[in-house]
């Protein structure tokens, strides 16, 4: 019986590409089978009374069944025998288009949707093939014989299964699609307005940058194109970061410097690190959130009212941190990096891989997409209405892949951001492979619990379960694995730069930003128990609770914050210029102003005291080998950098 189930599924899967019009299937994509990962089975006696009523009729014979959310998938989803790949499956709690084709002519049909206990949830009339959704750019239809219906999101839960009933027939075999659990992604937009950027000298409205142009139509398309139950594009809790200058770190051949115009060649250099620190300090780096910083950088040497200097974008792969010029194509490209995606072109050619299955970083071999917001399919071929419909040679080093008829395939957004879509489409189409990798990234992150005061992670059964983070490795890397410990509280975000070499203008506090949100844990520098917890002396064999907190790179500085009501807060600044695991030994080049070892950067998200008084003064205190100091010594330490507000 097990063998026959698998054989039936493989027969169905083998015909899906012909139904979809995709004529290049020489990929390493495989169709999954098995009882728990999407299956086609014969009816049992528990299905439903509806099915028992027509049991005397001949069963409906299906040629294929597919499901579409962001992509059109076989019941078992898709997987790849490649390094670092994911599994692309349907997700719970999302409207799902079901597509059915038959072995014989039918006049009418319905799909019956059941829960995991075989209780009927919905009976949906299937629309005729003539009513199938169109294709982006008025391209060729996905199918000329597929019947379709939309399964509502409430019905899409673990164990859901369907049976199709053609007029005059009994129900088909049971089809059980593989489902990932409910997966959500939040994309946070944090505009960086630098060197005097304002609405008089930039080409965009700041309110639009705060949500990356996500009006209802754009937000709907963003959700539709991502393989998640929900995708939110929102303004970051910090709102906007504004500064008339940036501090560029030492380059190795030149010292740190204060940059005050985008005319400087290092005009955008510090931003990505700043975004990374924001992700880290707020605790977002552990969660299902990414941050994109649309950056407006003013070049004061430019004539005319608009003085922004253009550039591309950057991200730390898999970190959740990204930045770039404000465009939806770059949001998808740099956001893709933040979600763990490398460049598709290099991934397809990497001799250690490949890490991307389709030639030249293209969509040749990828499944069709489906945009439920626009109500159309998206072919892996370049849309006829694209300016790249007629394509020759290469694009950015990637050779255009073509069908035998000369049609060009799109490149994945991780190679070419947005040129091959219909002009009315907001976002490019990700390959099925990269969609699966993004699902894997989100499945490996925690999410906030429903009350927004704790966390959930996926357990071994694939269900969301409550999770309490613990500190590992004596806090050598993080306390409580850099999960937030305060939630939705009034908080001040503070960034500090400091040159150990005394480089002019390189030691600064950026203006603090008050926001309402989350923050990770910091050590109180004037609490004796806190100081004891980070004691890095392990010579006796005994270890403090957080003994490696300072052992990795030292703890030599303290942040002091004074509020308008006279109250103060002191926090240990983790990280200095000490040698790894030698917290009392300076690095060799710590006084060389051209060396990166001479430059320190910290970010702290500090919960405001009761009553939320405003910050009045910021100070960087000199507290070498901090764990050996007393609270009194910390409070009396010299201030190296002071900012009055």
Swiss-Prot record:
Binds 1 zinc ion per subunit. Its main location: secreted. This is Dictomallein-like protein. Residues 1-13 form the signal peptide. Zn(2+) binds at residues 333, 337, 343. GO terms for molecular function: metal ion binding; metalloendopeptidase activity. The keyword Zinc applies. Residues 177-448 form the Peptidase M66 domain. Its EC number is 3.4.24.-. The active site is at residue 334. Residues 19-55 are annotated as: Disordered. It comes from Hahella chejuensis (strain KCTC 2396). PROSITE patterns: PEPTIDASE_M66. GO terms for cellular component: extracellular region. Its cofactor is Zn(2+). Belongs to the dictomallein family. The keyword Protease applies. It is found in: Secreted. GO terms for biological process: proteolysis. Keywords: Hydrolase, Metal-binding, Metalloprotease, Protease, Secreted, Signal, Zinc.
